[in-house]
C-alpha cells in the first residue's frame, strides 16, 4: 500500500 516504505520500495520498482 502507499505510504509503506514507499521511498525504499520505489527503488525496487525503479531498480533500473
From Swiss-Prot:
Keywords: Ribonucleoprotein, Ribosomal protein. GO terms for cellular component: ribonucleoprotein complex; ribosome. It comes from the Eukaryota. Belongs to the eukaryotic ribosomal protein eL21 family. This is Large ribosomal subunit protein eL21.
